[in-house]
């Protein structure tokens, strides 16, 4: 009764045990997971080292060649967050461009010797004719100062007087109360000025920012993307598009365009406007500056302006008529963002640096400062006509790269002109809500790079992932480590990013091979580029960056492999562990939901906070397994006693036996020598070579007696008394051999007795096994007969029941059939009876 009452509880326990289905932590290598990262990027360009064009020089020293086959992989079902205002790529590009400018100025001459007193007069140049046209009649005069000053010659104690033309913005009067014509250069009390080398050019060339191996660049392909928020159209690339590092304020020149519409990116008081169409701007400096050279010291040459041929007023820029429509569209967009009461105005020219109050850019080596009031003032009618911007030219320029650093741009001979495209604006706004004032701005060059890099961000590939699995690590045996082969391209590793975890885990081996092969491929490309330009990369900031990028990926890969090795997962794409999975790590998400609905990226975000805990538990479990394996291996040595009788170990046993016998013989020889020496020292001589000396009988536990007359004699034995050294040695060797013979005989008897006992035990064991076999066979035969009889009885009973049922069914069918057949007869009989 008690057994029957316990059955329900037992069944319930079994059902609970089966239904619990515990999960274990499983390690996956090669999962498509990435995280936001900051790393050292390097640049690539299409510059040619053999080209004689000056603007290729710095690109060949700075960048590696571009990839002729750039790869871009579209990530389906992936949503990624971008924030252009916190994008470290823009800050890194800022530092890199600064380094490039400073590097290009390193060998150039410092102009400290020019910080002297100058006597200056106004100079309007030598007019070569009336070249003023109607379109330039309202341009500003470009006033010049003709200054003379004393400089030190190549011989230090001698001086000479020279003269040079300076723009009025580059000199300031010295107010010492003596003479109103004394001037100095504007930089002398604030800025260290370097003269640009004669061959230095600031013409930009497109550069591509590239991620090192082990990293990737995410790209947002959505139109009208604000640069801050989620993007659903995401792809991964290795390098950005070609970015021209054009330095300018107020207007963005030669940048990228949006594919759909005008986009305004707003952050704080900054407004970055990106157009979808370009507006051309053509700038000109007519006339001919005649340049001269003045030696200001040993190997130091100052390139000055000797005279100007032509009209000094003709420095200007022409903005095409498309400006009006694009500016009107931009204003509507800004009013929609800030409010309808927003007003627009140009920069105040009364205060501030020229770089902020004017449009500053470099045109063919000269620095232009253009008045943009005609572009931004609402009073100006800008519809369907070309706008002329008056420009100034400065030779002493405050560099945007560092505070208190400047550059002297040597004069450029001949006519200067350059054509650019306006692709956006840099604006600021101020005022209270509803009454905003928008005006052009500049000076913070990082905004230029943000405008180009808004759709990019750098991520690091994290190929190691953990997830719950139903399998548990069972054994501690060593497995052969698998080696990964080389596969496809690196970016294909993220191709399964939008797939669910179950679908992506099927291709883990391919993804792991892709990861390694991509690293190897990128390392080879980078090494080839560096080897091709190693003579140019010396002492270059970019050379250091490229070498760092070269080492970084291998370090990351080795780190991942070391982690897998510590977990006992080296060389495996799927590795099972003995760590139970805690449902709280995954917020109690069901197993089927994890593997069928989540991508690896979504799963990583869910368990990221617990990754450290899980990794520690896996490492502890592996350490415990190593301890268990060591103990098992030590125990396994005692479990293999039969290996002691392996034929390969017999020589070792024979060697040990020979050493033991040699040791015993050596000890006996030493004992014999000591005995001989003792006898010789006693000084006796035996009477004969052999004398019979009776010995007393000894009991089993009595010491041997040698004197006569002590007790009775059982038997006599002869003791050999010899003389001579060789005879004594022979006697001792004979006794030793007899001793060894007796010991070996005893050992053989013991071994024979042991073998007899083992044989008897083995025979007895075989008899027991035979009896057990007979009993088992009898039991099997008995139960087989019983099962056979039961089966026969069951078949007989079934046959009888079926036969009886069949007979009854047949009889019933016959009765029904006869009844149906008798119906006409019964009808006829009824009719006959009715008629009678």
UniProtKB/Swiss-Prot annotation:
Residues 434-441 are annotated as: V5. Residues 605-639 form a coiled coil. The record marks 481-482 as: Cleavage. A motif (Di-leucine internalization motif) lies at residues 835-836. Residues 283-316 are annotated as: V3. A motif (YXXL motif) lies at residues 684-687. Highly glycosylated by host. The high number of glycan on the protein is reffered to as 'glycan shield' because it contributes to hide protein sequence from adaptive immune system. The keyword Disulfide bond applies. Residues 349-359 are annotated as: CD4-binding loop. Residues 1-21 form the signal peptide. Glycans are attached at residues 77, 121, 130, 134, 146, 150, 180, 189, 224, 228, 233, 254, 276, 282, 288, 318, 328, 340-341, 371, 377, 381, 384, 415, 435, 582, 588, 597, 609. Disulfide bonds join 43-63, 108-197, 115-188, 120-147, 210-239, 220-231, 283-317, 363-418, 370-391, 569-575. Residues 370-391 are annotated as: V4. GO terms for molecular function: structural molecule activity. The keyword Transmembrane applies. Residues 545-563 are annotated as: Immunosuppression. CDD domains: HIV-1-like_HR1-HR2. Residues 634-655 are annotated as: MPER. Keywords: AIDS, Apoptosis, Clathrin-mediated endocytosis of virus by host, Cleavage on pair of basic residues, Coiled coil, Disulfide bond, Fusion of virus membrane with host endosomal membrane, Fusion of virus membrane with host membrane, Glycoprotein, Host cell membrane, Host endosome, Host membrane, Host-virus interaction, Lipoprotein, Membrane, Palmitate, Signal, Transmembrane, Transmembrane helix, Viral attachment to host cell, Viral envelope protein, Viral immunoevasion, Viral penetration into host cytoplasm, Virion, Virus endocytosis by host, Virus entry into host cell. Residues 120-146 are annotated as: V1. The chain crosses the membrane at residues 657-677. Residues 482-503 are annotated as: Fusion peptide. Residues 678-836 are cytoplasmic. Inhibitors targeting HIV-1 viral envelope proteins are used as antiretroviral drugs. Attachment of virions to the cell surface via non-specific interactions and CD4 binding can be blocked by inhibitors that include cyanovirin-N, cyclotriazadisulfonamide analogs, PRO 2000, TNX 355 and PRO 542. In addition, BMS 806 can block CD4-induced conformational changes. Env interactions with the coreceptor molecules can be targeted by CCR5 antagonists including SCH-D, maraviroc (UK 427857) and aplaviroc (GW 873140), and the CXCR4 antagonist AMD 070. Some of the most genetically diverse regions of the viral genome are present in Env. They are called variable regions 1 through 5 (V1 through V5). Coreceptor usage of gp120 is determined mainly by the primary structure of the third variable region (V3) in the outer domain of gp120. The sequence of V3 determines which coreceptor, CCR5 and/or CXCR4 (corresponding to R5/macrophage, X4/T cell and R5X4/T cell and macrophage tropism), is used to trigger the fusion potential of the Env complex, and hence which cells the virus can infect. Binding to CCR5 involves a region adjacent in addition to V3. The membrane proximal external region (MPER) present in gp41 is a tryptophan-rich region recognized by the antibodies 2F5, Z13, and 4E10. MPER seems to play a role in fusion. This is Envelope glycoprotein gp160. It comes from Human immunodeficiency virus type 1 group N (isolate YBF106) (HIV-1). The gene is env.
């Amino acid at each position: 009764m008690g057994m029957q009452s316990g059955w329900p509880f037992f069944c319930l326990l079994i059902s609970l045990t089966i239904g619990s289905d515990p999960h274990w932590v499983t390690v996956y290598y090669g999962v498509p997971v990435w995280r936001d990262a900051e790393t050292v990027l390097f640049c690539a360009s299409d510059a040619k080292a053999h080209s004689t064009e000056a603007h290729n020089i710095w690109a060949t020293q700075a960048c590696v060649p571009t990839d002729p086959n750039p790869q871009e992989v579209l990530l389906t079902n992936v949503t990624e967050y971008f924030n252009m205002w916190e994008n470290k790529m823009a800050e890194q590009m800022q530092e890199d461009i600064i380094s490039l400018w400073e590097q290009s100025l390193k060998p150039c001459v410092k102009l400290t010797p020019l910080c002297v007193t100058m006597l200056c007069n106004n100079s309007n140049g030598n007019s070569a004719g009336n070249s003023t046209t109607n379109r330039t009649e309202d341009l500003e005069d470009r006033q010049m100062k003709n200054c003379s000053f004393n400089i030190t010659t190549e011989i230090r104690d001698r001086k000479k007087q020279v003269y040079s033309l300076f723009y009025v913005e580059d000199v300031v009067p010295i107010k010492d109360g003596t003479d109103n014509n004394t001037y100095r250069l504007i930089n002398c009390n604030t800025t260290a000025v370097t003269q640009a080398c004669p061959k230095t050019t600031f013409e930009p060339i497109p550069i591509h920012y590239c991620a090192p191996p082990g990293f990737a660049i995410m790209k947002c392909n959505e139109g009208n993307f604000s640069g801050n928020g989620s993007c659903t159209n995401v792809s991964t690339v290795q390098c950005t598009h070609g970015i021209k590092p054009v330095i300018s304020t107020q207007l963005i020149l030669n940048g990228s365009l949006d594919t759909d519409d005008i986009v305004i990116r707003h952050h704080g008081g900054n407004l970055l406007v990106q157009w979808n169409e370009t507006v051309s701007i053509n700038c000109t400096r007519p006339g001919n500056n005649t340049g001269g050279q003045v030696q200001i010291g040993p190997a130091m040459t100052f390139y000055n302006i000797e005279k100007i041929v032509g009209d000094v007023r003709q420095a200007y820029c022409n903005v095409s008529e498309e400006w009006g429509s694009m500016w009107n569209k931009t204003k509507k967009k800004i009013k929609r963002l800030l409010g309808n009461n927003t007003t627009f105005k140009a920069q105040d020219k009364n205060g501030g640096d020229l770089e902020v109050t004017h449009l500053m850019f470099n045109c063919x080596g000269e620095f232009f400062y253009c008045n943009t009031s005609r572009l931004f003032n609402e009073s100006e009618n800008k519809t369907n006509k070309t706008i002329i911007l008056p420009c100034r030219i400065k030779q002493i320029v405050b560099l945007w790269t560092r505070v208190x650093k400047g550059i002297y741009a040597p004069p450029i001979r001949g006519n200067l002109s350059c054509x650019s495209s306006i692709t956006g604006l840099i604006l600021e706004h101020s005022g209270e809500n509803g009454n905003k004032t928008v005006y052009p701005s500049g000076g913070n060059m990082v905004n230029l790079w943000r405008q180009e890099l808004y759709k990019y961000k750098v991520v690091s590939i994290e190929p190691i992932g953990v997830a719950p699995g139903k399998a548990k690590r069972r054994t501690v045996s060593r497995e052969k480590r698998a080696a990964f082969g080389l596969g496809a391209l690196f970016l294909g590793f993220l191709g399964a990013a939008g797939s669910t975890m179950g679908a992506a885990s099927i291709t883990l081996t391919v993804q792991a091979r892709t990861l390694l092969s991509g690293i190897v491929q990128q390392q080879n490309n980078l090494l080839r580029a560096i080897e091709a330009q190693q003579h140019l990369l010396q002492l270059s900031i970019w050379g250091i960056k490229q070498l760092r990028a070269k080492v970084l990926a291998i370090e990351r890969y080795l780190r991942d492999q070391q982690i897998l090795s510590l977990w006992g997962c080296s060389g495996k794409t799927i590795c099972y562990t003995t760590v139970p999975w805690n449902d709280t790590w995954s917020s109690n998400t069901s197993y089927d939901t994890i593997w069928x609905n989540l991508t690896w990226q979504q799963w990583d975000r869910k368990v990221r906070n617990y990754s450290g805990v899980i990794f520690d538990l896996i490492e502890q479990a592996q350490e415990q397994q190593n301890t268990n394996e060591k103990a098992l291996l030590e125990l396994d040595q005692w479990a293999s006693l039969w290996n002691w009788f392996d034929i390969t170990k017999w020589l070792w046993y024979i060697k040990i036996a020979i050493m033991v016998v040699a040791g015993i013989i050596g000890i006996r020889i030493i004992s014999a020598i000591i005995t001989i020496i003792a006898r010789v020292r006693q000084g006796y001589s035996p009477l004969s070579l052999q004398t019979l000396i009776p010995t007393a009988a000894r009991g089993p536990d009595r010491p041997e007696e040698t004197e006569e007359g002590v007790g009775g004699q059982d038997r006599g034995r002869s003791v050999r008394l010899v003389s001579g050294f060789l005879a004594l040695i022979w006697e001792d060797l004979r006794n030793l051999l007899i001793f060894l013979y007796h010991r070996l005989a005893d050992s053989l008897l013991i071994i024979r007795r042991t073998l007899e006992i083992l044989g008897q035990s083995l025979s007895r064991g075989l008899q027991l096994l035979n009896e057990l076999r007979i009993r088992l066979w009898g039991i099997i035969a008995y139960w087989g007969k019983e099962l056979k009889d039961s089966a026969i009885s069951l078949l007989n009973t079934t046959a009888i029941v079926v036969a009886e049922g069949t007979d009854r069914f047949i009889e019933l069918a016959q009765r029904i059939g006869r009844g149906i057949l008798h119906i006409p007869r019964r009808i006829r009989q009824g009719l006959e009876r009715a008629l009678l």
